[in-house]
Design a protein with these regions (language model features):
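Active-site neighborhoods and metal-handling regions in enzymes and metal-associated proteins
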Residues: 1-108
């Protein structure tokens, strides 16, 4: 998750964020074919299919200030799955986290 979040800033193409994630997981033998993030906020123009921008290969949409994105680092296999995510606002030199919840992992 951090590798994607740290790549977010104004002027970066959406596909570049996803590429960071892919380069992180593929050497470990994992592949994720679905997007790594999607827009959030008021409305989903042009429709609920979210055909605006996504963190996926081929999406050349340039991140602009104050865009909102739900970024998710997720892997699903036949044996297990995991997902961690963060909702953020794109800023000039990075991102602003929308939640104040710690991402600390607790093991019982």
């Amino acid at each position: 998750l951090d590798v994607m979040l740290n790549a977010i800033k104004v002027g970066v193409p959406c596909e570049d964020i996803e590429l960071k994630w892919r380069k992180c997981i593929e050497p470990k033998g994992y592949i994720k074919k679905s997007r790594a993030g999607y827009p959030i906020g008021l409305g989903y123009p042009p429709d609920w299919g979210e055909q605006t921008y996504s963190l996926r290969p081929g999406d050349k949409t340039i991140l602009l200030e104050n865009m909102t994105i739900h970024v998710l680092a997720a892997i699903w296999t036949e044996d297990f799955g995991y997902e961690v995510s963060e909702s953020v606002i794109v800023k000039e030199k990075g991102y602003e986290q929308l939640s104040s919840v710690s991402r600390q992992l607790f093991v019982k």
